[in-house]
């Protein structure tokens, strides 16, 4: 599966679907979440539950995550240039991506190359991504927020689940897991 994933990344078999985020009061679409899917030429759509853990274990999540971020930013910028109202695009981050030494610069470069205003990008991470990294995580998240984007904790309640601890981090949104 790992060699197939490497080939899939090289040959463009991954696709991004956009799940709309709707204001329940007005019914207006306010944003979307970028969701990566693998369209294998033999198996068809491969479940993220099958390939994301392997991507994490092998480190392939870093180039895959960069591709998703670049693709989602380019698409959101394209929608704006086509006259659509500005939408916030949310992109999930892996802990491995966040640990890359040049990650903040990479995000800034992608925003610059795609022309997407940082205010239209929301990066989502899980609480386990930042827990235990303390001041290092605070500094990195602060640097990301300084770019002008927003940050969200996704699936809160599935891990450490300490609101007191989370107050230390520059987070804009907390998405509570349904099991919390």
Summary of predicted features, one role per range:
Residues 9, 80, 145:
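Conserved ATPase "switch" residues in P-loop NTPase domains
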Residues 17, 24-33, 60-137:
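Catalytic core of bacterial c-di-GMP phosphodiesterases, primarily the EAL and HD-GYP domains
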Residues 105-180:
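The catalytic core of metal-dependent phosphodiesterases that act on cyclic dinucleotides
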Residues 4, 10-13, 56, 60-65, ...:
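Signal-transducing alpha-helical linker
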Residues 49-53, 62, 142, 164:
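Conserved long alpha-helical elements within nucleotide-processing catalytic cores of c-di-GMP signaling
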Residues 1-54, 92, 153:
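Active-site core of bacterial EAL-family cyclic-dinucleotide phosphodiesterase domains
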